């Protein structure tokens, strides 16, 4: 079945490879590793486009490329995510996220164009912790909400892989879930695996237990909470409506809010990891009750890393290629514009007034309009912000 998917990916790459704009196209993730479930797996591509040129920053060319992708998706609906980088951006991303870099270096399959150099670097612990947070916030909560047994098992395996990498039990992330399961079965966490494989509904308990172990190795212990905490919030930095559901511990019953649209399910320990290793901006809208548990605010360095992670320039090309929303890039430019003066002064940025981004969210353009009219401006400002953020990170590291 992997041969069928790879053939479909190759044909898609041939259609999308439009020189001189599109320079390289890779298959990555499940198609590249051969871990295919027919009718369920998506075709995910990694595309390198040329370095943006002129005042338009290749916005019209990206709009045209998006149009080709829309046409192609009519015939190949499995073609879901196309992650688009420019040459300078892919180098930055591979240096910024060594976890993903390790996986791409060992599995990405060139389908069209010239090869990219994937650096062979050690996986940083902080990148593995952040990847665990990405899986829990972005995918695990969705699997719980949908009661999707396959995705509960899948995300729990990926979370253990990130956990084991962060704990130093494996030197680099596994590439397939059978490999993860085999390594897990050999580890000291093996007693958690059998219940998960027999009954994926135990995944929340397993994930929360792993998060507590990881938290204990990285951050001060938190005071216990007696009952679930539920809060509706506009979650920065992308300002999407979410329901934050914090359950006391790994064996807690899940409240009904955990199954509602937009839920974000966690324990206090998992939320603390998320705040310090992935999304420091959450402190702007975090319920006050959490500070009573001993959750500490993120540092200036953690805010800088958060800006670099969320503000990498490939996210400017997410609209249409990765996700349907077109407003997040401009919103995050506004977030960084607000934060930079405080970070330069060595201060934690205060909360951004949501009214400053409300206009972007309300007036979301179509992807073609975004690339022709908005992208050139956000691209130029993003590049200027990136230079400042890198200088800040180097200064903080040297001090």
Residue ranges of model-derived segments:
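Short cationic amphipathic helices and targeting signals
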Residues: 45-47, 245, 257, 264, ...
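N-terminal regions immediately upstream of nucleotidyltransferase
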Residues: 1-6, 174-192, 201-203, 321, ...
